[in-house]
Amino acid sequence: MSNYPKPINRLIEALSYLPGIGPKTAERLAFHIVSMDETKVNHLITALQDSRDKVFECSTCNNLTDKDPCTICQDESRDSNLICVVQDARDVTAIEKVQDFQGKYHVLQGVISPMEGIGPDDLNLKALMDRIQGEGITELVVATDPTVEGEATAMYLNKLVKPLGVRVTRLAYGLPMGGDLEYADEMTLQQAFEGRKEL
């Protein structure tokens, strides 16, 4: 244990709970916070508290929101027959930045991962099935990560939803813009070939 005062040690410990923050970074952040002026510290405290107390999952799509239903679910200009299925709320934000998708979302809150003990029953699939059957969904765009777990989840969704007459599509994956072909792995190249489009 360090010779720092107990409040600083507690702050370092609390900051190290955050993903990607090791002991040294937590220590640097703690000392930065201690040296900040009171207004900024109070703003940080309020932002942390509000994020924890006032942000919750939308009862329709499970996206993070501060009103229910969320603004995307309330937006009548969006195509309510089209749902993009994502792993978590950060994926919704990433897709929204592109400003190309005009449907609605459904956040699974994870992917099927037997290694981590996560099966279909651990995902938010019942609510998705209720939406498909109750809202007249015609297409499901599966936008899970291009990982073994993401692919397994996409295949499971396809098997689950296809019998209901819903079109199931998957985002195309492949080479990134500006990427060098020689550095691409085999799976990326394979998916790039499979997802090729006519010019």
Curated annotation (Swiss-Prot):
GO MF, one term, reads: DNA binding
- Which BP terms in the Gene Ontology apply to this protein? DNA recombination; DNA repair
Q: Where are the zinc fingers (C4-type)?
A: 58-73
Sorted alphabetically, which InterPro entries does this protein's record hold?
DNA_Rcmb_RecR, Rcmb_RecR, Rcmb_RecR_Znf, TOPRIM_dom, TOPRIM_RecR
- Kindly state which keywords UniProt assigns to this record, in alphabetical order: DNA damage, DNA recombination, DNA repair, Metal-binding, Zinc, Zinc-finger
Q: List the disulfide bonds.
A: none
**What Gene3D superfamilies does this protein map onto?**
3.30.60.80, 3.40.1360.10, 6.10.250.240, RecR Domain 1
UniProt family annotation: Belongs to the RecR family.
- Entry-linked PANTHER family: RECOMBINATION PROTEIN RECR
What's this protein's function? May play a role in DNA repair. It seems to be involved in an RecBC-independent recombinational process of DNA repair. It may act with RecF and RecO.
Q: What is this protein called?
A: Recombination protein RecR
Native species of this protein? Natranaerobius thermophilus (strain ATCC BAA-1301 / DSM 18059 / JW/NM-WN-LF)
